[in-house]
């Protein structure tokens, strides 16, 4: 996917001050309920979950549900399983078309975390802000829908329905569904001591989009202008937007090639939160230890200049449509990282070995002084495509 021109509201006959991100007070997957609160809220759903499964198919086929990236439900016939996920987010970038692509990629990412590469069907869930003027609604929402549709088509699937409602905030999400044979998905519970942890997208998207908005807020920009330039911020923002819109489909396919033992995608709970959640699901007594944090260039410095208000160094900074965190056999991990960069997968993208799986008590932690890997922006060397539907 090529870099796009910056979204210009006036090209769509909108006021130049229009910002999509102003139609929600929370950003991206920063809307997630905290993990500990979520677990308490879902306790009543979990009580009878596995009892029903045992009555249905016993332990013949794997089942996954409450609290994980997707649900895996054994079907009554044919040895098949239904794999399904739903997700939604609030606007995190001001380009409506890219926001649609990001929302779609974010939904699909939960399937990809299971090693599923084919999605049979998608539904789109839209909340149209009742604070939008008629003109804003009629110009912006079709761009969002087109972005969502284009990302679905890139994933080899289609949008066949959904639900659209009025809401105080703009809400973007969907449902992704597929029917799989057991060898088409990878249960996220087989990590063993000696595995390594691989991450397929850099961290820091939430920081990048936040500081990009600070360019228009002098009192906030003044706090960080000594550690980052406006050009640095623009590049980080473009890189974050492209990363969020990029599908994790290639990584999902390579999970099979290189014998992945478990995976999750990194979104609203931050890398540590999702690593902890994945560690809890393991059948073996293991723990995850993270030594390296790949971060969008200059965003670690920005985070430190802000007193680490984003939680980036602690692993609690939310990501939107982040990468996959994959447990791979040590001997396979370097080959995975080399393969995902191959031009045969389009532009080719980096992945990083960030930690290890060791014998433990199903916890995850980041070491006291993790190595920060500054990830240079790829967008600087790419062609710029015009925004679709804009008038000159």
Swiss-Prot record:
Its EC number is 2.7.9.3. The active site is at 31. It is a peripheral membrane protein. Mg(2+) binds at residues 69, 110, 265. The record marks 32 as: Important for catalytic activity. GO terms for cellular component: nuclear membrane; plasma membrane. GO terms for molecular function: ATP binding; metal ion binding; protein heterodimerization activity; protein homodimerization activity; selenide, water dikinase activity. It comes from Xenopus tropicalis. This is Selenide, water dikinase 1. Its cofactor is Mg(2+). Keywords: ATP-binding, Cell membrane, Kinase, Magnesium, Membrane, Metal-binding, Nucleotide-binding, Nucleus, Selenium, Transferase. Synthesizes selenophosphate from selenide and ATP. InterPro entries: PurM-like_C_dom, PurM-like_C_sf, PurM-like_N, PurM-like_N_sf, SPS/SelD.
